[in-house]
UniProtKB/Swiss-Prot annotation:
Gene3D superfamilies hit by this protein: Cadherins
Membrane-topology descriptor: Single-pass membrane protein
Gene behind the chain: Cdhr1
Protein name: Cadherin-related family member 1
Taxonomic lineage from the root: Eukaryota, Metazoa, Chordata, Craniata, Vertebrata
Domain Cadherin: 36-135, 136-247, 248-354, 360-473, 474-577, 569-691
């Protein structure tokens, strides 16, 4: 009973104790590399941007009470971080710099409101490549002797980089225009004179080289970066005595004028020690004194002449001057020599002068033929030019003054004296016909003297004529028009040719030749063209002549011109009727026509007018004066009217018709015309007879009508055969024509008509007069049933001047008439003036006949 209350008491006290106990919160320790916990062994790169969330404090309270976080720093240090008290997020608020502060001490704490737990942490700042190399002990100025051996070490540069690792390692290299003479060790920074290189104080007293120091690179803000630095090393070259004296102002030329006094200074030679850093004293002397003509001052280097220049024999003297260095101890050192050229200058007191074979001369004459060969030398001119001065005063130019481009003078530049040569440059310009003589001035003028002395000489060239021109006509062609009835020996036209050459070469001889020249002559001296004494010209035979006329000089040089002669027609032919007595039949109401021809060549001589000069009885017929158509007067309209006019009551009349040309004077011819008059009723009784009567005077009309009828019959036959063939073709069968003819025989009237036409055609053709048998055009070797076409007589042979290769052909024309007529004698053509004129045919007529024969050969 007693133990129960005690136990209860103990339990009660325990509960009260437990209720009043509160345990402290604590941080989690998550180890290295964790971004939350108690920041144990936490490190942070120095390039972390300000404001970055870098860590999260994380802890807990055993009772589960709310906790808060805090971070604090030593008052003597910076507050680098801040913390969110509720969530424990730590933020960087200051930039980190490992080179200044590689560790940061901080106190972090956690509290549940009653208990506060604090811990001291060390935050390691890790390196980033944020530092560039930096050279130590700048600036770099060093002194190096110029005789330093190649490959020697001359200096060492040093740079440091505060970064660690590769970012803190430094390498060196050169970046300079003079890097070809120097080199640097990339690891140690030692500068050396490159192998094969030398220093020369006299050429370059200082060298400036740029050395670059570069780190090994590293990460910075998430990128790989490399930093570098540069410095300039000034290398001053120290002079040493290693160079001979140097002459200043070389080369040395001195001039002594011929009026210079003895003892006058000519020029001064200047030399300096080649080692300019520590120069020695210089002494001068002449190695050759030129026979005592010149001397030199040993300290100043001044050279003087000792004698009068007029006594000097040479124009140019060459001296050799030697200089010697004297060191501080007074002993000779390095030496040098230099040549000195001294020229004796002549005064310009003589102008250039021209000389001939007998002495000074200012005029030269020469005779030569025109048009000499290109490049020929005028050997007849003996010219010498001289300038008595010396040197530049005796230098002058030569040139010709006058018409340019004809001659060229050689030489063009002369020193002292030269033989003058004149060469032909333009042969065409040396023309006797243009100029009988050529005059030039030969000018010599000094080149480099201020006085510019000059001299001139006249050159006169007399030209001799040669036969270099061809006679030339005043025109390329001559046109003449003469009447056809001019008598023989009449003047036609005068041609003129001119030869500008002189003497016998300028005389011109004329001659003519060519087709059409046989009827003409030319005076050999005057060029007058006239007709042959026996020539008889006829415009109706040949109306135009053309030939060539030649003008020739005595050497055979010639030119040609063409002459055209046109014959003017003269009314010398009478109109001619075909027959002097003609019989014609006139159908009442239809005119008939008569025709006369006039053989004159041109109008109006060959135009014919017709008139009735006599009629019995009169006032029955009218005639058209231009066409020759004869018709009854309008008042006569029937045979009864005609019957009442004649006393005998006949229908036949005799008329005398006149044909008169329009020439001046005019010619006329008359013919007797017998006319039989009938009317249409009589002709209708026999249509064929009427047709024959109507075509009595025109047989070709009858032939044409018959040929037309035959052509129509043949065409109808061809159409019937073609239609039959195409009809059978549609049924894929080809039937012989004979079968078609049997099925469909020709109507009887057609047969009668064709037989009648054949009869008439054979009857009419029997009256034709054929000159030769026609060829077998059907090529069947059978002439039975073949109608022979009429043929005209063969053409006469072509003229002798025509080509013999043209074949003679026959012309298929009708040579008969439907009604026989008594033969009529054609008028005899007028002779062409004898055998000479009959053989003369113009070229135009020949071409026309050739063309006509060629065309007929293909008919």
């Amino acid at each position: 009973m007693r133990r129960g209350p005690q136990v209860a008491l103990v339990l009660g006290l325990l509960c009260i104790y437990l209720a009043q106990a509160n345990f402290a919160p604590h941080f989690f320790d998550n180890g290295v590399g964790s971004t939350n916990g108690n920041m144990a062994l936490f490190s942070l790169p120095e390039d972390t941007p300000v404001g970055s969330h870098v860590y999260t404090l994380n802890g807990t309270d055993p009772e589960g009470d709310p906790i808060s976080y805090h971070i604090s720093f030593d008052p003597s240090t910076r507050s680098v971080f801040s913390v969110d008290p509720n969530f424990g997020n730590i933020t960087l608020v200051e930039e980190l710099d490992r080179e200044r502060e590689d560790e940061i001490e901080a106190i972090i704490s956690i509290s549940d409101g009653l208990n506060l737990v604090a811990e001291k942490v060390v935050i390691v700042v890790t390196d980033a490549n944020d530092e560039a190399p930096r050279f130590l002990q700048e600036p770099y100025n060093i002194l190096v002797p110029e005789n330093t051996p190649a490959g020697s070490s001359i200096f060492k540069v040093q740079a440091e980089d505060k970064d660690t690792g590769s970012g803190g390692s430094v390498t060196y290299f050169l970046q300079s225009l003079h890097s070809s003479k120097f080199t640097v060790d990339r690891h140690s920074g030692v500068l050396r004179l490159q192998a094969g290189a030398t220093l020369d104080y006299e050429k370059s007293r200082a060298h400036f080289i740029t050395v670059v120091a570069k780190d090994g690179g590293g990460r910075l803000r998430g990128a790989d970066v490399v930093f570098s630095a540069t410095t300039t090393v000034t290398i001053n070259v120290e002079d040493v005595q290693d160079t001979a004296p140097i002459f200043v102002g070389t080369p040395y030329y001195g001039y002594v004028y011929e009026d210079t006094l003895p003892g006058s200074e000519v020029l001064t030679v200047v030399a300096i020690d080649g080692d300019r850093g520590k120069p020695n004293h210089i002494l001068y002397r002449l190695l050759n004194e030129s026979d005592g003509l010149f001397e030199i001052n040993e300290t100043s280097g001044a050279i003087s002449v000792l004698q009068s220049p007029a006594q000097l024999r040479r124009e140019v003297y060459e001296l050799h001057v030697q200089v010697t260095e004297v060191n501080s101890s007074g002993s000779p050192a390095a030496q040098s020599t230099v040549p000195v050229i001294i020229r004796i200058v002549d005064l310009n007191n003589h102008p250039p002068t021209f000389y001939g074979e007998s002495g000074p001369q200012n005029k030269f004459e020469l005779s030569m033929f025109e048009h000499p060969p290109q490049g020929e030398i005028l050997r007849g001119l003996k010219i010498t030019v001289n300038d008595s001065d010396q040197g530049a005063n005796a230098k002058f130019n030569l040139r010709l003054v006058g018409p340019g481009g004809i001659f060229r003078v050689v030489p063009q530049t002369v020193l002292n004296e030269a033989q003058v040569t004149i060469i032909v440059e333009n042969s065409a310009a040396i023309d006797f016909e243009k100029s009988k003589s050529l005059t030039f001035k030969l000018l010599a003028i000094e080149v480099n003297t201020p006085e510019k002395f000059s001299s001139t000489a006249d050159i006169v060239i007399q030209l001799l004529d040669t036969n270099d021109n061809v006679p030339k006509f005043t025109s390329h062609y001559y046109i003449a028009r003469i009447p056809e009835n001019v008598p023989g020996g009449s003047n036609v036209v005068a041609v003129t040719a001119v030869d500008p050459d002189t003497g016998p070469w300028g005389k011109v001889q004329y001659s003519i030749y060519g087709t059409g020249s046989d009827l003409f002559l030319i005076h050999p001296s005057t060029g007058l063209i006239y007709t042959q004494p026996w020539a008889s010209l006829d415009a109706e035979g040949t109306s135009r002549y053309n030939f060539y006329v030649k003008a020739e000089d005595m050497d055979g040089r010639y030119s040609l011109a063409e002459v055209f002669v046109t014959l003017l027609d003269v009314n010398d032919h009478y109109p001619q009727f075909v027959q002097s007595v003609q019989e014609k039949t006139m159908v009442l109401g239809t005119p008939l026509k008569i025709e006369a021809t006039d053989q004159d060549a041109e109008e109006p001589n060959n135009l014919v007018d017709y008139s009735i000069t006599r009629a019995e009885p009169v006032n029955v017929f009218d005639i058209d004066a231009h066409t020759g158509e004869i018709r009854l007067k309008n008042s006569i309209r029937s045979l009864e009217a005609l019957h009442n006019i004649t006393p005998s009551g006949e229908y036949s009349w005799s008329l005398q018709v006149q044909a008169k040309d329009r020439g001046s004077p005019s010619f006329s011819t008359t013919a007797l015309l017998k006319i039989d008059i009938t009317d249409t009723e009589r002709l209708s009784r026999s249509s064929m007879a009427a047709f024959l009567i109507q075509t009595k005077d025109n047989p070709m009309k009858a032939v044409g009508v018959l040929a037309g009828v035959m052509a129509i019959v043949v065409a109808i036959t061809v159409l019937i055969s073609t239609a039959t063939f195409w009809r059978n073709k549609k049924s894929n069968k080809v039937l012989p024509v004979r079968r078609v003819l049997r099925r469909r025989p020709s109507p009887a009237p057609h047969t009668v008509r064709i037989e009648w036409l054949k009869f008439r055609r054979a009857k009419a053709a029997s009256k034709f007069i054929l000159k030769e048998d026609p060829p077998n055009e059907n090529c069947n070797n059978s002439r039975v049933g073949v109608t022979v076409p009429p043929r005209a007589p063969a053409l006469p042979p072509p003229p002798k001047m025509a080509s013999s290769t043209v074949a003679q052909q026959t012309v298929p024309t009708v040579s008969g008439s439907l009604t026989p007529q008594p033969s009529q004698q054609l008028p005899t053509p007028k002779p062409l003036g004898g055998p000479a004129q009959s053989s003369l045919v113009s070229e135009l007529k020949q071409k026309f006949e050739k063309k006509s024969l060629g065309n007929k050969a293909y008919v």
